[in-house]
Design a protein with these regions (language model features):
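Rossmann-fold NAD(P)-dependent oxidoreductase module
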Residues: 13
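A conserved beta-strand element that flanks and buttresses the S-adenosyl-L-methionine
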Residues: 64
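Class I SAM-dependent methyltransferase "Motif I" SAM/SAH-binding loop
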Residues: 2-8
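An acidic- and aromatic-residue-enriched active-site/binding cleft used to recognize and process polar
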Residues: 5, 26-29, 118
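Class I S-adenosyl-L-methionine
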Residues: 3, 42, 50-57, 69-240
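Adenosine-cofactor binding site in Rossmann-like domains, unifying the SAM/SAH pocket
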Residues: 16-54, 125, 130-132
C-alpha cells in the first residue's frame, strides 16, 4: 500500500511481481492500471483514514507514504515566518499528518513501513530520519537503457540526480543497500556555473506552482522503489502478506 502517492511508482515493482497493490491520494479517481488499484482519498480526514485501516487490517505487507511536504521542506523555509504569522500551528499540523502515516500502518498490523520527506522541519518535529539518500545512490537498480516513463524531459535516466531525501521507517522495514550511479552534470539555473547542480534537475527546470510541477518535483525515485522491493519482498512472504 502507498499513501499520498500520485504516480504509483513506489508500488510498480510489487505489482509486476504479482502483489495486490493499493495507492491512495486525493488526486486519484478510482481506477485500476498496471496492476495497481488507485483510490481517491482525503488522507487528512479521520473518517477516511479509519475506513482504509478497517479495509486492510492484517492484510498489508508494506506501507510507503509520501505526505505533503509544502510546509515542512527546508527549500520553503523563507516562507515559514509569514505562514506562521497567519497560522501559528501550520507546521505542527503538517508534521502530525506525516506521523499519522506510521500510525496508519501500525493500526493495520504492519511494522514494515516508511515515510518519505525532504530535508526540513520533520526532523525537528518528529525525530531524526532513520535513513538519508540521494536518488542517484539507487540508480544502479535501473537498466542502463532506462528512461523515465512519466517525466523524461525533467527526470534523468536512472535517477541520476541529487535530492537529499529522508526516510523514517518502522522496525520491520529493511533499508536496501545502495547501488550508486554518477549524477548528471548540469548548469546551475541560478548561478550559471558548471558542475553538479545543487538542485534536482526537475526543480531547476520547472517553474510555477502548478500541481503538475509539484508532482514532478515529488515523484518517487524509481531506483529507490526497486531497491525497496528487492530488500523487502522476501520478508512479506515470510509474514504471509
Amino acid at each position: 500500500m502507498s499513501l499520498f502517492d500520485y504516480t504509483g511508482e513506489a508500488l510498480k515493482p510489487w505489482a509486476e511481481a504479482g502483489y495486490e497493490c493499493f495507492a491512495y491520494d486525493i488526486q486519484h479517481t478510482r481506477t485500476h492500471r498496471d496492476g495497481i488499484s488507485f483510490f481517491h482519498a482525503d488522507l487528512h480526514d479521520s473518517a477516511t483514514v479509519w475506513t482504509i485501516v478497517e479495509r486492510h487490517a492484517g492484510k498489508v505487507g508494506l506501507v510507503s507514504a509520501f505526505p505533503v511536504c509544502t510546509d515542512l521542506a527546508a527549500s520553503g523555509a523563507c516562507w515559514w515566518a509569514g505562514k506562521r504569522e497567519a497560522d501559528p500551528g501550520f507546521q505542527e499540523r503538517a508534521a502530525r499528518r506525516a506521523m499519522q502515516c506510521a500510525e496508519i500502518a501500525e493500526a493495520m498490523g504492519c511494522d514494515a513501513w516508511y515515510v518519505e520527506n525532504p530535508v526540513g522541519a520533520l526532523s525537528r518535529l518528529w525525530r531524526k530520519p532513520d535513513h538519508v539518500f540521494d536518488p542517484c545512490e539507487y540508480g544502479g537498480y535501473l537498466s542502463v537503457t532506462d528512461e523515465h516513463p512519466l517525466y523524461p524531459p525533467h527526470i534523468p535516466p536512472r535517477d541520476a540526480y541529487r535530492k537529499k531525501t529522508c526516510i523514517w521507517h518502522g522496525p520491520g522495514f529493511i533499508v536496501p543497500p545502495k547501488r550508486p550511479v554518477e549524477p548528471v552534470q548540469v548548469v546551475c539555473a541560478r548561478k550559471r556555473t558548471g558542475g553538479t547542480c545543487r538542485y534536482a534537475p526537475q526543480a531547476a527546470g520547472l517553474g510555477g506552482k502548478s500541481q503538475r510541477t509539484k508532482n514532478i518535483r515529488s515523484a518517487t525515485p524509481r531506483g529507490w522503489a526497486a531497491a525497496v522491493f528487492e530488500a523487502n519482498f522476501i520478508y512479506t512472504l515470510l509474514r504471509g502478506r
